[in-house]
Amino acid sequence: MNNLGNFGVWGFGFFSLSIWFAVLQQANGLRPIRETARSWGDEWLFGKKEKGGAGPFSAWNITGTYRGTWKFLDTVNSSSKFPDFRKESGNSVIELVTSPTKITGVHYVQGAVVFHDVFDNEHNVGGAQIKVEGVYIWPFRQLRLVANSGKKSDSGLEDDYLLSNPYHLLGIFSSQVFQESPRDRILKQKTSPIYEMEKHCNIEIAAQISQSTSSENNGDKDRYQIEGLMESPAVDDEVDCFSPLSLNATSINVEVYYNKAVNYTLMVTFVSFLQVLLLIRQMEHSNTQSGAAKVSIVMIGQQAIMDSYLCLLHLTAGILVESLFNAFATAAFFKFVVFSIFEMRYLLSIWKATRPSTSGEGWETMRRELSFLYSRFYGILLGGILLMYEFHNYMRPILLLMYSFWIPQIVANVVRDSRKPLHPYYILGMTVTRLAIPLYVFGCPKNFMRVEPSKAWCVSLCAFMGFQAGVLLLQHYFGSRCFVPRKLLPEKYSYYRRLDHNVNRSRDCVICMTTIDLRHRINDCMVTPCEHIFHSGCLQRWMDIKMECPTCRRPLPPA
């Protein structure tokens, strides 16, 4: 009996010790995340390899940007608190930043969820953005997020990630340049129902993380997929803010996105190099004073302003996205070369050719006129920047206006009756190279700027530019006024007017110093308004250089 009593006492003591040890372990597990130390039991349960590893419990770094869709589980939103949520589905972007905690297998998560196409078009408030935080239990691939209370995080991990992510930074850049201005965005946010949602709703997201392999750019990349459910129970009553919706998003390969931006800058560099070659060809085509005077200074100035804007845009993008600075700075440098060296030099030569020459003027007069030219050019440059900022919502019509740079040359050809001012290669080459950037931005469905493509606008731009180039080519081959009715044209001086056939004497051409036989065909000689006679070929070649009479230096009308 004594042995049985001792055995019962020992058994009861061992059972009590086991219960006390179990309660102690449970209490230890209820400590805060940041204060709980790693235990031997945790390492045994979740495995010692938290980073890397190929086992079933290997940690996945889910920090990144995810793009996908959202959809209401019901046909329509059944909430009466926010009836503006009328659309059934739309696009979404999820930004997540994770950091390890002292509990093995649990990561702290911060981020934001952006819902596009939430409201009707009549509200025009853009996407709804919600800041979230929670935990990621990586052994079970479970993600739990709730709406952030709005207080600033101590770690700053989310801000550091967004400031170093080229996808996020270039999205901000393109939204300010091509989509909406900061002032409009702030006004939309003030009137957005999203603020009421943050006040009256609790956002809860439960998601599962899965892994998939993508072979983009000839390389296998691990991509993560988020599939989950988002619910929004109300704070003050039992009515939900909106119906439950499903989330489905896939991680973005930042390396592929980076390569897209680099390829774009290579395209801009190549296009700029082609434009330099075309400008050199055109400058050789109009290397005389008469040839340069036929070119419209407004046409060259408009192209120079366009290239200066592109230089500033690429330089700003390179400064904003530090990891892409070298690529964008190279593109900006080539645009600066096109603008400052070649186009400005050509603009000055045109200005000098069209400027009336007076014999008694001094250097002060020329310097004053040159400074006036530069002040007008840079005044238009700065004024254009202010106008584009003010009328930011009308960027596409403004681009159509900027891409009408051939129209001043067409009008100048008709007014002056100029003969072949531009080389055909320059017309075709500039038309094609100028279309490269807008067609990429507004036509490529997967451009790195994330601008919504518009096929109709791209077709309109190509047709508009093609029409201008076609008119210039018609003027080149069939005459500057070939499409203008003769009734509307002023009377034109004829260099092939009839001579007095009773005059049977020969005259000398002062250009080639040979005799002109007036008894031959009338088309073999040309007569100026000042009654001087020259060979037709000699005077035409002379007028390609100077529009002055070789004998008396009087101005000559266009032929």
Curated annotation (Swiss-Prot):
PROSITE patterns: ZF_RING_2. This is Transmembrane E3 ubiquitin-protein ligase FLY2. Residues 281-294, 340-370, 416-423, 480-559 are cytoplasmic. Residues 1-29 form the signal peptide. CDD domains: RING-H2_TUL1-like. Disruption phenotype: No visible phenotype under normal growth conditions. SMART domains: RING. The gene is FLY2. Its main location: membrane. The chain crosses the membrane at residues 260-280, 295-315, 319-339, 371-391, 395-415, 424-444, 459-479. The keyword Cytoplasm does not apply. The keyword Signal applies. It comes from Arabidopsis thaliana. GO terms for biological process: plant-type cell wall modification; protein ubiquitination.
